[in-house]
Curated annotation (Swiss-Prot):
GO terms for cellular component: cytoplasm. NCBIfam families: PRK05421.1-2, PRK05421.1-3, PRK05421.1-4. Belongs to the UPF0294 family. This is UPF0294 protein VP2298. Keywords: Cytoplasm. InterPro entries: Endo/exonu/phosph_ase_sf, Endo/exonuclease/phosphatase, UPF0294. The keyword Cytoplasm applies. It is found in: Cytoplasm. Its main location: cytoplasm. One of its GO terms (molecular function) is catalytic activity. Transmembrane segments: none annotated. It comes from Vibrio parahaemolyticus serotype O3:K6 (strain RIMD 2210633).
């Protein structure tokens, strides 16, 4: 009986491993996928662009931050079209590079940089930063979930602004399944370190998976040295964990906050964040 149980357990483990390998493909190094029109390129870690133009619109900078739930809801496209209107920058998490999503990027004349954290059934998944203009540079970063072993991703980008400054942007999907906060803090601290050599304006935003008070404290401590301010939303319908704590955040520096809203949407398991800034003189 015991031998049969052991054999059954071994079979289940082997089946789970094989299924994981069939469904998920994890690259050896962080990869960044860039789509400009219908042209798609893949690079290891970083990509730089020459002749980047100003991202803002006459000093106005409007952005959408949204965990889009791998476009699993039927109305993702219509809602994304609605929320991306008049935006110069879209910071999405859990974006899946399906054919329909690629076509949406082409139709909107967007330039996108995605971290290919892993592929699920052939479609790349990870954070993606989408803009009306090319960045100066973009670099991919990944951190593995301690239990699931699938990477969470972050993208560091720099964009030119019309006032002569450059904007540093970090789009993050933070590690989720941990007992303590060690891995969580390590991921955010490593990203915050990227900002130490940047003297201009900053946006640090995404799905921080901040579902406990310990994580909230770790998040704020990790970002303290960059002197970032947290955006307050009105209305604030940010998706909350059962603890009542919001999961998504936007931090900034060197910009003037104009308004910030977190409306409701049934197109994802997260609600979108809509934020408007103006450049400082």
């Amino acid at each position: 009986m015991f031998k049969r149980f052991v054999l059954s357990l071994a079979f289940l483990i082997m089946a789970a491993v094989v299924s994981f390998q069939v469904i998920f493909t994890v690259p050896e190094h962080p990869q960044i996928i860039t789509q400009t029109g219908s042209e798609i390129t893949e690079d290891i870690r970083c990509i730089e662009f020459s002749g980047a133009k100003a991202l803002d619109d006459n000093g106005e900078l409007n952005l959408l931050v949204w965990n889009i739930y791998k476009q699993n809801r039927a109305n993702w496209q219509s809602e994304l079209e609605l929320f991306s209107a008049d935006k110069q920058l879209l910071l999405l998490q859990e974006a899946s590079m399906t054919d329909s999503f690629k076509q949406w990027l082409v139709d909107g004349s967007w330039v996108s940089n995605q971290v290919s954290a892993f592929k699920a059934l052939g479609s790349g998944a990870g954070v993606i930063s989408i803009a009306q203009k090319q960045p100066i540079k973009a670099c991919a970063y990944t951190s593995k979930e301690p239990w699931l072993r699938l990477p969470k991703s972050a993208l560091y980008s720099q964009y030119r602004l019309s006032n002569g400054e450059s904007l540093a942007v970090i789009n993050v999907h933070a590690i989720n399944f941990t007992v303590g906060t060690e891995e969580y803090t390590s991921q955010l601290s490593a990203l915050e370190t990227l900002l130490k050599q940047h003297s201009g304006p900053i946006v640090f935003a995404g799905d921080f998976n901040s579902w406990s008070e310990y994580r909230i404290t770790a998040m704020k401590q990790a970002l303290r040295e960059a002197n970032l301010r947290e955006v307050q939303f009105s209305p604030d319908h940010r998706t909350q964990f059962i603890t009542g704590l919001p999961l998504d955040h936007v931090f900034y520096r060197g910009l003037t906050l104009k308004n910030a809203k977190a409306p409701q949407s049934d197109a994802s398991d997260h609600n979108p964040l809509l934020v408007s800034f103006t450049l400082n003189d």
